[in-house]
Design a protein with these regions (language model features):
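N-terminal signal peptide c-region/cleavage motif recognized by signal peptidases
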Residues: 18-21
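C-terminal accessory segments
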Residues: 118-120, 125, 289-361
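Right-handed parallel beta-helix/beta-spiral solenoid domain characteristic of secreted/periplasmic
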Residues: 76-142, 293-296
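Predominantly extracellular beta-rich ligand-binding scaffolds that present long acidic/polar faces
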Residues: 63-69, 77-79, 97-99, 152, ...
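N-terminal extracellular ligand-recognition/capping segment immediately after the signal peptide
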Residues: 29-36, 47-80, 85-93
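Bacterial N-terminal signal peptides that target proteins for export
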Residues: 2-9
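Surface-exposed loop/turn segments connecting beta-strands in extracellular beta-rich domains
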Residues: 59-60, 85, 90, 111, ...
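Right-handed parallel beta-helix
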Residues: 123-201
Length: 373
């Protein structure tokens, strides 16, 4: 569930959300089961839902977890939802998932020997990833390596991608150390990117091609990502390329402490920033409102890599914005965004006056915690 935009035309909304066809559902409790589910999902002629039970899953020997709709002769080009956080219920090992799941409970581990997950879509499927931690991805193939945690190869992909309430920790690649993404519309919301290391450049690399719609980055925490390169173009932060007439909307993000540049924008598209804390930016910004500055003041110490909750006094607390409640149809690009109901640790998304900035929601301060009333 998520904080949804309430569209004025209910019928149009219902049509937009109606499924393309029957969905096949899989449950994975081991590396082999997960890869088998992805193999079947690529060719079975159905939209597919792959549920991953809570646990840690090493990447297969000799390659990443792989969803490839081009290699099989009969790849179906239909949609995939991959979600973590599932637990046993009445004999089904993937029978239940709380809406308040913890995104660090389901880990796909590249073990520093393989990319974690590669998705090669064909045509215009919807690709959705929820509640997965991508850990220690390191692609083993030769040539230019992209997307150490997750690679969405986009040459034949004209569908939509959504990555939500997921984490990318300690991945590496030449470009896009954590994520390489493409598609007609990309939504990255309420994710953590920390400790990833690019041989050349970028923790996230997203290219929005000619004729595509754009990219939404909403409520992400993207910090302390590195580059090994000393080249003038190298940087450890987010890289977005926009063709003419494409769009990027960045709302409620923390992008800070990344090597050289936190956000690098290229191309000729339209870029809107709202209520972000972004330190070092390069490139043209069309519109910016609600800029936040200063030390984000996270609760964790130097060895913390999973909890970046804003501490008391943080400029991130109650400085985010919510999606518009009413928008016209068809919705303008800058209004057509949303937020999950829960943060990365499974806490309700709004604790105070409004949402906090970043992937974590601070809990209310107990003014009587010292024992005096």
């Amino acid at each position: 569930m998520s904080i949804q935009n309430n569209r004025l035309l209910v019928l149009a909304s219902a049509l937009a959300l109606s499924p393309a066809g029957h969905a096949a559902t899989f449950c994975a409790t081991s590396t082999a089961e997960l890869q088998n589910a992805l193999d079947t999902a690529a060719v079975n002629g159905e939209n597919d839902v792959v549920r991953v039970a809570v646990g840690t899953y090493p990447a297969p020997v000799g390659g990443p977890f792989d969803f490839d709709q081009l290699a099989p002769v009969n790849g179906d080009g239909l949609s995939l939802t991959l979600s973590g956080g599932w637990t046993a219920f009445f004999g089904n090992p993937c029978g239940f998932r709380s809406e308040a799941y913890n995104s660090f409970d389901t880990i796909l581990d590249g073990e520093d020997r393989e990319r974690v997950l590669r998705i090669i879509p064909d045509g215009a499927p919807d690709i959705v990833i929820e509640g997965i931690t991508f850990f220690r991805g390191n692609p083993s193939e030769g040539g230019t390596r992209r997307g150490g945690g997750l690679e969405i190869r986009s040459a034949n992909f004209t569908g939509k991608l959504r990555v939500e309430r997921s984490a990318f920790l300690f991945n590496t690649a030449d470009y896009g150390s954590a994520l390489e993404a493409g598609g007609s519309l990309i939504r990255l919301r309420n994710n953590l990117f920390v400790g990833n290391d690019a041989v050349n450049s970028g923790v996230i690399e997203a290219v929005i091609g000619n004729g595509d719609s754009g990219i939404y980055l909403t409520a992400n925490t993207i910090i302390n990502n590195a580059t090994q390169s000393s080249a003038a173009s190298a940087q450890g932060g987010v890289y977005i390329f926009l063709w003419t007439d494409t769009n990027a909307l960045l709302v409620n993000n923390v992008i800070q402490g990344n090597d050289v540049t936190d956000l690098k924008l290229s191309g000729e598209g339209n870029v809107t920033l709202r209520n972000n804390l972004i330190d070092v930016r390069v490139g043209s910004i069309t519109t910016e409102t609600g800029q936040i500055t200063g030390d984000p003041m996270f609760v964790g110490g130097l060895l913390n890599f999973t909890d970046f909750t804003p501490d008391v006094g943080s400029p991130l607390i109650d400085t985010g914005i919510k999606p518009p409640a009413l928008i016209p149809f068809p919705p303008p690009f800058d209004s057509n965004w949303g937020l999950p109901d829960y943060d990365l640790l499974g806490r309700p998304r709004t604790q105070g006056v409004t949402v906090d900035v970043g992937a974590y929601e601070a809990l209310p301060v107990d003014v009587f915690s010292d024992g005096f009333e």
